[in-house]
Amino acid sequence: MIVLVIEKIYAFLWGDLITIPLPQESSIGISLLVILLIPTGIYFTIRTRFLPVRLFPDMIKALMAKKETKDSLSTFQTLIVSTATRVGMGNLVGVVAAISAGGAGAVFWMWVTALIGSSTAFVEGTLAQLHKEKDPLYGGYRGGPAYYIHHFCEEKLKKKKKHVLIAVLFAISGLICWCGISQVISNSVVSSFENAFGIPPLYTTIVLVAIAAVIVLRKNATVKVLDVVVPVMAVCYFAITIFIILKNIGSIPAVFGRIFEEAFGLRQAVSGGFGAVLMNGIKRGLFSNEAGSGSAPCAAAAAECETPVSAGLTQALGVFVDTIVICSCTAMIMLTAPENVVAGKEGMDLLQSAMRYHLGEFGVIFIAVTLFLFSFSTFLGILFYARSNVAYLFGDKWIFQTLYKILALVMLFIGGIAAYTFVWDLGDVGIGLMTIFNTGILYLLGGQALSALKEFESTK
């Protein structure tokens, strides 16, 4: 019964809610989440006067500001945490799936989604800073959508409340989502290691869970580990991609030509035509950069910065890094490989085949290790996010923080030895519900972020 209910909710959130017919027997199927996120991104892009382009230098400047204290984080460290969760399987398997289902043109629409998603990320990151509070458990600050939703409702009701229903529902949705993602993470890692090294899933799972437990059960080890892992993995992946591009420099103009031709339906590469290209690019872009879902603000709130806008600008930059840089790296690896090399393959097998073509067996090993690092950092990042939501629901009690970490580790173990589609759907339902609650409140509270932006620009 519960499984059936989850499947129905999943279909409602992620399935095609509206189908728009197009010429040449093509159509666009639009899901509820696309209906929510794309207009929200466009709205805030207009209201911020195209912030991702106009204030890109300020994003870099905000990132360089060093203002962390003993307990709180700098804007750079919060970018590291949010990038850890954004840069995950979606940047590898997700991009592969988008190109497989929507052709090379899907890459262009992922770029577009990132540009408008940056504005949404700015607004939610700024709001997280405006409504943060002291964290007596871990030190520094905590916050996120549960907190700014709570403060908004208190203000409207004109009375203090311990909990607000919508904020509670957001926090619960987040915890459900992140537990589900834990399973997906371990399943992807063990599959990749089995393909690359022939290691049995159980062995990989035990090592993965053991390493994770050592880190997450220590008070503040998560951010310290991510400070090292995330920059190293991102730079290495980018460097390998540059090498592959230079190795195939003669085919790069044709690759970009293919991306733009297929993006606008000038060349049909997949069944479904322009509609399939457009929606696959948009959906994968939204899933990868997480803008609007309310995840990243949990990290943005932890920053110690001169102005709330600095946290917002840093999160906007995070969307750029995730989609424009890392997702594009995967796309270049895929699209510079001959079609006969990747024909008939899907998922990680497809990406590993492309890497084998470019770099031999080293490429297969490299992509397996990269997936491990991307996925492991995602797991650490989502447990950082969970801190503030657990505290909102259960108060400042270590027992509940520890119990949730143990639950996530159990889910990590289960995902490594068995694949339960139900739990994966549960994770997607969780992030879908988070998005509904968060985007709704962004329209109501977004004026605060826009006012902060106006004040920031007036003092530049």
What is each model feature region?
Residues 1-89, 99-106, 117, 413, ...:
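N-terminal alpha-helical transmembrane segments of multi-pass membrane transport
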Residues 69-101, 127-130, 137-152, 169-172, ...:
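Alpha-helical membrane segments and immediately flanking helix-loop junctions
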Residues 40-45, 113-141, 150-187, 191-215, ...:
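Helix-loop-helix module between adjacent transmembrane segments
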Residues 36, 44-60, 166, 187-193, ...:
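Membrane-interface loop-to-helix entry segments
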Residues 116-124, 204-219, 230-250, 283-286, ...:
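Selective recognition of specific alpha-helical transmembrane segments in multi-pass small-molecule
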Residues 124-136, 242-258, 272, 302-305, ...:
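Extracellular/periplasmic helix-exit of transmembrane alpha-helices
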